[in-house]
Amino acid sequence: MLKINYKLRIFVMLVVTWLITALGVTAQVIQEQGDPTLAAPLEPLRSGVTEEHVFAEMASHNELRSAALLDYTAFRTYQVVDLKGKVHAEESGRMEYRAPDKKTFVVTSEKGSGLIRHLALNPLIASEIEAASGKQHHDSSITPANYSLHLVGEQQVGLYHCFVAQAVPKRVDKYLFEGKIWIDIQDFAIVRIAGHPAKKLSFWIERADFVREYQKIDEFWLPRRDETFVQVRLYGKKILAIDHQDYTVNGMSNRVVLQTSAGSF
């Protein structure tokens, strides 16, 4: 029995890693109604805003930001936890990006299960580095080629006032998702993504939900918090959390821009 459980644990960690690296965005277990960043009510959409306009503005703003982003460094903490909050494994370190396609990660501390770090955390980090270099390419960008958007209103998300849209994938693909996106009305940047994979990933994955949250640092929008919630058949529920902190962008130390709710539209 111990041997079977050991093999199942290994298999589960591999499946969780597959989920995270396949989807490219990650998840958190809290429901929207319990999320303090979504305490504000959904407001009616202002007149004159169309899905086509939002897509066009997102593309142009993203192109400008990508061209201006030369480098960044961030301190990251990866954790695998259970629903009681017990940390089963943790890995912390410094992620460095250099335009156009180089990422490196330097580990500064490790805690908990070495097996989980080896089977889940290390492959996750390696996959991100390979994706940045172009060794793994899957077009999962939020563009008209991959998604239809249906604007449903506006909402304050923490510091940022956003358009809210349902994102509907145009094909059944494990690299795409179905859910909601929150788009900053001034910068046309993604503030929050929440949903689930467009394609069932495995017989073993009974449920998979995700959220990614971003923050504005200077003129750029970079990840703030990820969590992945996965319910695995015969094994239960696990959460992988990633915190992104202490950014240095283009040689400048972390300065989170406080944004008012006034729109530019």
PLM feature spans:
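N-terminal secretory signal peptides that target proteins for export/translocation
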Residues: 1-8
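Intrinsically disordered, low-complexity proline-rich regions
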Residues: 7, 13, 51-53
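Short N-terminal leader segment in a subset of presequences, especially plant chloroplast
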Residues: 9-13, 247-250
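Bacterial N-terminal signal peptides
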Residues: 11-22
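Structured extracytoplasmic
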Residues: 28-178, 185-189, 198-208, 215-216, ...
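Beta-strand-dense domains in secreted/periplasmic systems and polymorphic toxin scaffolds
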Residues: 193, 224-226
